């Protein structure tokens, strides 16, 4: 079944320091697996636009955060509002390159035991895709679609958070 995932995203313009992953148990220390991230990639990160500035997140059961998040619909181009100093690179429309974060909260109901993937039509430029704090994919070009398998990490019937960190620090054509 296909779902439209364009609505209901949260966006933060700028990079956010990601905390190191929680420590793995001694049995798994030698494995090459990722462990759950903290910070904006995690399931329990406080990104609600209405909760901006909340200093006591115990009632929210979420990590404390001071970043402002806004609601957006995809496709979304955060560089269109970027700072445009005349000393910038004209190939980028003079925009200053920087990273940003997108997050999507969703509760799947019909995925139990099924292969589940999310298809991205394109993300400019480098990106990392997380589900519930687990790094699932990296993609390094703006002009190609890619898919991410969510099957092993998705939680049917529970809230899930898909987080995407986008970084356009490397040169990439920006033509408006």
Task: List where the protein language model places each region.
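N-terminal glycine-rich cofactor-binding segment
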Residues: 83-91
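Accessory beta-strand-rich segments of carbohydrate-active enzymes
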Residues: 3, 12-16, 34, 77, ...
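Accessory carbohydrate-binding/adhesion or oligomerization-edge regions at the termini
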Residues: 1-84, 163-174
């Amino acid at each position: 079944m296909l779902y439209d995932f364009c609505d209901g995203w949260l966006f933060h313009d700028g990079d956010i320091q990601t905390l190191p992953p929680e420590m793995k148990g001694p049995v798994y220390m030698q494995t090459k697996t990722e462990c759950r991230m903290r910070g904006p990639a995690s399931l329990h990160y406080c990104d609600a636009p209405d909760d901006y500035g909340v200093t006591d997140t115990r009632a929210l059961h979420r990590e404390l955060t001071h970043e402002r998040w806004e609601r957006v619909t995809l496709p979304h181009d955060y560089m269109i509002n970027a700072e445009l100093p005349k000393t910038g690179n004209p190939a980028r429309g003079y925009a200053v390159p920087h990273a940003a974060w997108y997050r999507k909260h969703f509760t799947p109901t019909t995925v139990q035991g099924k292969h589940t993937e999310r298809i991205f039509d394109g993300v400019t430029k480098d990106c990392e895709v997380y589900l519930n704090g687990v790094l699932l994919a990296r993609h390094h070009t703006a002009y190609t679609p890619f898919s991410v398998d969510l099957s092993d990490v998705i939680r049917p019937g529970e809230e899930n958070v898909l987080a995407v960190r986008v970084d356009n620090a490397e040169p990439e054509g920006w033509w408006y």
